[in-house]
Amino acid sequence: MSTNWRELFPTKLTFVIFLLYMSLFIGQGIFVTASQESNNSYGYNTVTVVLLTEVFKLIVSTCLYCRDNNLRSLVRDVQKDRNVLGLYMVPAFLYCLYNNLAFVNLATFDPTTYYLLLQLRVVVTGILFQIIFKKYLSQRQWISLILLTLGCMMKQVDFGSFYSDANDDSESAAIQQQLQSHNKTTSAETHAHGKNMSGFDFSLSAVFILAQTICSCLAGVYNEYLLKDKGADVNIFVQNVFMYLDSIVCNAVILLLRGELLDAFSPQNLGSIMRFSVLIIIVNNAAIGIVTSFFLKYMNSILKTFASALELLFTAVLCYFLFSIPIYMNTALAIAVVSYAIYLYTQSPVVNLGKVRPLSNLSDATTKSTDKRKLIDEEAAESDLDMV
C-alpha cells in the first residue's frame, strides 16, 4: 500500500510534532551518555533524577488538567476513581524499574546498541499477546519477529572473521595481517570508553537489558489486560496523575531501600543535579510524555514505525560525531534489518481492541477529545517510552 505523505502530514504542525517526537527519543540516550563521567559512572543520584522527572510530569499534567477544570475537581476525580489509582501501581512499578535500568544500561552500552536491543520488546510483546490474549501471530508477523531478533543478533557478528579461511598465499597473508591489525583496533574500540558495542555478551549487562525490555512489555500488556475497560472512562490527564503519583511512590521506596531517601535531597546531591547536563534529561524525558500524546492524537502507527527506524539511524550518526563511536558494517546491517522488521510487523500488528471501536481513519482521532480509542492508544504507548 503506497504512502500518501499529505495524509501522513496534513498540516505543518503534524510535521513539527513528528520531528519533536523523534528528536526527544534520540536526545534521551545522547543526553544520558553525555552526563556520564569519564569512567561511565554518574556524578549524581540517578534514582533521584527519575523521581524528579515524575514530579515534573505530575506538575505539567495537573496544569493541563486545570486549563478546563480546577484543583478541587481534580481531587474529586482522584477520590472517585481511587480504585484505578491502585491499579496503576503495578505498571508504575514496572516503569520505575524500566526507567532506572535505562541509566544502568546506558552506562554499559552505547546508545545505538542500547536502542537496537530494546527493539526486542516487539518480539516479547507479540509473544505475550499470543499467550494472554490468544491473538495468534500470522506468518508475516512471525517472519518480522524472527527478522527483528536476527537483526539484534547481527550486531554481535564480526564480519572480519569470515576471511580467516582464506588461502595462505602472499596476498591472503597480507590480508590476514591487515585483519589482525583491524581486529585489535576493533577489540579496543568495541569497548571504547568502557562501553559494550557488540550487543549481548551473556553477562549481567545482558540480563539488565532483557529485564528492562520485559518490564516495558509487561507494563504495556498489563494496561491492555486490566486497565483498558476500567480506566477508559477516566480523563487522560487524571490517568497521568495516577501514573505519576504511583511512580513517585515507587522511586521513593527504592531510595528508602537503598538507604538514600534523606541523603538524596541533601544540598550536595541536589547541587549535582542542578546542572544543565542533568536538568535537560529531566526536561527531555518529561517532554516525551507530553509530545507522545499529541503524536498519537494527530498521527498514525505508520509514522511511529518510521520514527523508530530513523531514531536508530540518527542515533548512530550522532554518536559517531559526538562520542567518536564508530559505525561498523554489522551496526549498519543490524539497523537496516531491524528497521525493515519493524515496518513489516506494523503492516499487520498484534492488537487487542477489547470493547473499543477501532478508528476508521486519521481524522477520527481528532473529532472527539474523549474518544476511548485515543485514551487506550495513549496508555499503550507508555510501553514504548524509553524513560517515562
From Swiss-Prot:
Residue ranges crossing the lipid bilayer per the database entry: 13-33, 46-66, 84-104, 113-133, 142-162, 202-222, 236-256, 276-296, 309-329, 331-351
Keywords: Golgi apparatus, Membrane, Sugar transport, Transmembrane, Transmembrane helix, Transport
Principal location: Golgi
GO biological process: negative regulation of innate immune response; negative regulation of Toll signaling pathway; positive regulation of antimicrobial peptide production; positive regulation of protein glycosylation; transmembrane transport; UDP-galactose transmembrane transport
Record-level Gene Ontology MF annotations: UDP-galactose transmembrane transporter activity
UniProt topology in membrane: Multi-pass membrane protein
Gene Ontology cellular-component terms listed: Golgi apparatus; Golgi medial cisterna; Golgi membrane
Entries under Pfam families matching the protein: Nuc_sug_transp (PF04142)
UniProt-listed InterPro entries: Nuc_sug_transpt
Observed phenotype of the null mutant: Lethal in late larvae and early pupal stages. In immunologically unchallenged third-instar larvae, displays abnormalities of the immune organs, including melanotic cells in the hemocoel and melanotic tumors in the lymph glands; in the primary and secondary lobes, shows activation of lamellocytes and reduced numbers of hematocyte progenitor cells and plasmatocytes. In addition, displays hyperactivation of immune signal transduction via the Toll, JAK/STAT and JNK pathways; shows reduced expression of galactose-containing glycans affecting also spz glycosylation.
Compartments where located: Golgi apparatus membrane
Cited function: UDP-galactose transporter involved in the synthesis of galactose-containing glycans. Plays a role in quiescence of the innate immune response, possibly by regulating glycosylation of the Toll pathway ligand spz.
Record PANTHER family: NUCLEOTIDE-SUGAR TRANSMEMBRANE TRANSPORTER
Family, per entry: Belongs to the nucleotide-sugar transporter family.
Additional observations: The gene name means 'Buddha with a thousand hands manipulating tools to protect us' in Japanese.
Protein's recorded name: UDP-galactose transporter senju
Protein source organism: Drosophila melanogaster (Fruit fly)
Gene coding for it: senju
